[in-house]
Amino acid sequence: LKRRAEQQAETRLRIVEAAVALHGSVGPARTTYSMVAEAAGVQRHTLYAHFPDERSLLLACSGLAVERDPPPEPANWPEGADRLRAGLSAVYAWYRRNEDLAGCVLRDAEVHDLTREVSELRLGPTARRWQENLGAPLDPVQRAVLRVMLGFPAWRSLVRDSGLAPEQAVAAAIRAIEGSVA
């Protein structure tokens, strides 16, 4: 009995890992159960036995991704003047490590209700903590710019589209935030 439970757990993990890889390459909205089953090396009925619907699979995938590389927590950032730099550096480093998956998931969240729901569930509270924590000493206009700069599209534009090094992207974001006074 114990061996069977271990095999089922291994199969489940293999399915979730295959789905996460597909979500990072084609996106959750375009990932089909057939694609996941093939990538995991299981039959479709095995996949359905573990994940009877798309929501259960997406929740498992997002849970695994966040467990393996949790988004940065503001509690770990220093107080005072270095907080904004530390926070943006941590968020941007997390985006860099999760670029493919984040890019596909956030793209699909624009058009796929379930992806949007699960993204909000997994990342919404943390993103709000980033904004509240870093935005506390800022005026309303600066907080608005902070919200933009904390977004994945801003990071991608600064680093990928503009070719800035990570520390340059953080410095540019800080200048944009601090330079926008109400």
Predicted regions and their residues:
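Basic, helix-initiating cap at the start of DNA-binding domains
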Residues: L1-V26, R30-V42, H50, R55-S56
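Key DNA-contact positions within bacterial/archaeal DNA-binding proteins
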Residues: H45
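Residues in the recognition helix of alpha-helical DNA-binding motifs
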Residues: H50, A60, A172
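Solvent-exposed, amphipathic alpha-helical segments
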Residues: R14, A18-V26, P72-E73, L101, ...
